[in-house]
């Protein structure tokens, strides 16, 4: 039977490992916002960042994130979530100008990446919001062109 100190050591290792994995996963979007991981930037301010989803449902599918690491959107305080929605509205306005559509749909899921984020999706119909649909496969040049169009519109606002 292992000694108490060995069990504590193993527990500490598990906790450390779990924290490292959780922190690493949480940091992916933060690293994108900081420019440590490349992205297709669509808009930004001091608090929030918007970039194209690399597995888009439709062309222009954009993610908005807080720069601050927060897992669950409803863990944000009222003022911060209000500012986040105002930022998302600005990105949606730019998105609609860049990619004319009936409406820009908004979805908050957050099960795959533990960092609060809003999906903004240019919609021609409700089926464009079905996350079970096959994802588009766009070339890097197409992604960059789409991001540039959205960011150009964003800067006008």
Regions found by a protein language model. Give the residues of each.
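HIT superfamily nucleotide-processing domains
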Residues: 22-157
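Short, basic, low-complexity termini and linkers enriched in Ser/Thr/Gly/Pro
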Residues: 1-25
């Amino acid at each position: 039977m292992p000694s108490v100190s060995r069990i504590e050591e193993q527990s500490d290792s598990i906790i450390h490992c779990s924290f490292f994995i959780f922190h690493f996963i949480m940091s992916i979007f933060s690293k994108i916002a900081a420019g440590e991981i490349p992205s297709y930037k669509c808009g930004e301010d001091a608090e929030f960042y918007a970039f194209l989803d690399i597995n888009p449902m439709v062309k222009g599918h954009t993610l908005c994130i807080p720069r601050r690491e927060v897992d669950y959107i409803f863990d944000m305080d009222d003022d911060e979530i209000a500012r986040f929605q105002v930022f998302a509205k600005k990105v949606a306005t730019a998105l609609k100008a860049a990619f004319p559509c009936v409406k820009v749909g908004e979805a908050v899921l957050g099960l795959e990446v533990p960092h609060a984020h809003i999906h903004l999706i240019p919609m021609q119909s409700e089926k464009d919001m079905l996350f079970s649909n096959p994802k588009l496969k766009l070339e890097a040049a197409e992604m960059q062109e789409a991001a540039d169009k959205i960011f150009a519109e964003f800067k006008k606002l």
